[in-house]
Amino acid sequence: MALLLAAAWFGGAWAADPLGHFPVDPAQVSVSGISSGAFMANQLHIAHSAGIIGAGMIAGGLYGCAVDSVSEDGVFALASLAVGPCMSVPTLLQPVDFYAQLTADLAAKGWIDPPGNLARSRVYMFTGQADKVVSSKTIELGASLYRTLGVPGSQVKFRDQDLPGAGAGHSWVTQNFGNACDANAKPFINDCRYDQAEELLQTIYGPLQPPAVQPAGRIVAFDQTEFAPGKAAAANGLLDTGYLYVPKACEPGAAERCRLHVVLHGCLQSAEVLRDEFYTKTGVNEWAETNRIVVLYPQAHATSVAELSSQDFLSLFNTNLEGCWNWWGYAGDRQFLTKQGVQVGAIWSMVQRVTGQGN
């Protein structure tokens, strides 16, 4: 397995197998992410609220934050809004009613599920006091939007100034792995003596069994290209290979169905950059092993220098140099935050494949 994963990391000739079906209850699907992955988790949750029961957003996540306007064929979003108001100049953010109306408009067009589905959701949102990448106000507004869209306040857990983990930098926070707690640097996994995976999963699923000391399940590499339009994964910000953690109790043929949790890395955290670090070191797999949760780790792709050389000057503003998930409309995707979005659609197709609802 190590040799096969190495081939996937470095783009070797080896091609991963197709993603398979597993004994997963389609009514027990949830999603989480950090940074750009938090924005994508939020987009998945709101676009597919009929099929996702809960979401966790770490250091990101405000629906439509980079959207300027809506037209008949999609949304008009700006990278300048993403790096400005959404990340670093929160005083320029719109009031929560703007984002609520945007959500209603997209639902009226049939581009996302009716927001009324969100009332049953359970939501975890986190921002660290030392985060120098994404403003805490953005995450705070994201939590407010969930409440405005009908999620009861008791079902929205917003962690910012309160312990544990309050002093975190821009990172997924763990109990015993990663950078110093207040760091804002790769791998963007910080040791704050706080098991974020535990609280996130408990917020969504309720009480859990204690985690495994050493997960006994397996990591499965799978082919992501089949989920991209025309199998053009790289052109749409997707790596050729994604990963899945399968607990021993969730192998095909298991008598009892498991749950599915989708985890989305942030910028500079894909397997291109961190190898297996993100999908093995956040603490999620330990909890998944003992609580019958299959974990899907889709992978984003960073635009390479070679790919840049073939693009015109104006298109450079829509490139993805750090392997981020698409929350500002890069690659010309004007439906990036809806069910028709390339990445949202690809990830949802992966979910349907795992749960046996799709081909």
Q: What is each stretch, according to the model?
A:
Residues 16-36, 46, 51, 112-120, ...:
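Gly/Ser-rich "nucleophile elbow"/oxyanion-hole loop immediately N-terminal to the catalytic nucleophile
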Residues 19, 68-70, 79-82, 176-178, ...:
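Cap/lid segment of the alpha/beta-hydrolase catalytic domain
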Residues 26-76, 209, 359:
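Primarily recognizes the serine-hydrolase "nucleophile elbow" in alpha/beta-hydrolase
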Residues 35, 265-270:
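Active-site glycine-rich loops that stabilize anionic/oxyanionic intermediates
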Residues 65-147, 200, 251-253:
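The feature captures the conserved acid-bearing segment of alpha/beta-hydrolase catalytic domains
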Residues 149-176:
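Catalytic histidine neighborhood in serine/cysteine hydrolases
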Residues 256-266:
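Short beta-strand element of the alpha/beta-hydrolase
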